[in-house]
């Protein structure tokens, strides 16, 4: 976590079946880009947030339901889904052959404990925790994306406010946990 997250230059280390499938997809696009000269942007999205789904929903709903929050994956990145959608379209102008890698997420490294405590303030509840924060986490450094396109339009604190309001208003959920706390790739 102290490194600021993995940049596009870091060789991926795919842990678990899902991560391996994502890496395989990248390799196929890289092959096509090299073999056929097709311009490609490898859009590496980390934790897009929507009100019915996402790591913020997972944390907020646990705080609201007074369920303990696992701390082993002590921090994460996230970005508003609308900003991610815009960046997906805008990233087409960066496409290159060989393929261009682009990490896409928000600028903050967000502490799970901090996010839970922020939701606790909004809900008037004290979050419960289990485990201890590990010294590492799955993080992206999206500074290249921010240099190319600027910072996301929706801030982290705005996402926290919207998520809390959604849950307080009884908003719906997709019932698909992100498993952000998973450290061994078993989703």
Where do the protein language model's features map onto the residues?
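Active-site "gating" loop of Rossmann-like NAD(P)-dependent oxidoreductase/epimerase domains
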Residues: 1-16, 35
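NAD(P)-dependent short-chain dehydrogenase/reductase
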Residues: 15, 26-83, 119
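Active-site helix of classical SDR
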Residues: 17, 21
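Glycine-rich Rossmann NAD(P)(H)-binding loop
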Residues: 44-48, 70-79, 100-110, 132-135, ...
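Amphipathic alpha-helical segment in the mid-to-C-terminal domain
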Residues: 81, 112, 152-156
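Amphipathic alpha-helical segments that line or abut small-molecule/effector binding pockets
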Residues: 82-93, 161-164
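Mid/C-terminal beta-alpha module of Rossmann-like enzyme folds, strongest
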Residues: 87-144, 182-186
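Amphipathic terminal alpha-helices
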Residues: 156-187
């Amino acid at each position: 976590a102290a490194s600021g997250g993995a940049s596009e230059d870091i060789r991926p280390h795919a842990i678990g079946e899902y991560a391996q499938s994502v890496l395989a997809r990248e390799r196929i696009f890289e092959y096509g880009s090299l073999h056929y000269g097709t311009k490609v942007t490898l859009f590496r999205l980390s934790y897009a947030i929507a009100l019915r789904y996402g790591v913020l929903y997972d944390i907020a709903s646990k705080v609201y339901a007074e369920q303990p929050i696992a701390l082993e994956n002590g921090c994460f990145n996230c970005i508003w889904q609308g900003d991610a959608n815009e960046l997906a379209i805008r990233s087409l102008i960066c496409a290159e052959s060989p393929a261009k890698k682009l990490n896409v997420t928000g600028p903050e490294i967000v502490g799970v404990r901090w996010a839970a405590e922020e939701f606790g303030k909004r809900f008037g509840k004290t979050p419960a925790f289990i485990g201890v924060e590990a010294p590492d986490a799955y993080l992206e450094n999206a500074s290249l994306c921010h240099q190319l396109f600027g910072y996301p339009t929706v801030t982290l604190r705005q996402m926290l406010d919207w998520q809390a309001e959604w849950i307080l208003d009884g908003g719906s959920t997709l019932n698909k946990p992100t498993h952000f706390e998973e450290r061994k790739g078993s989703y």
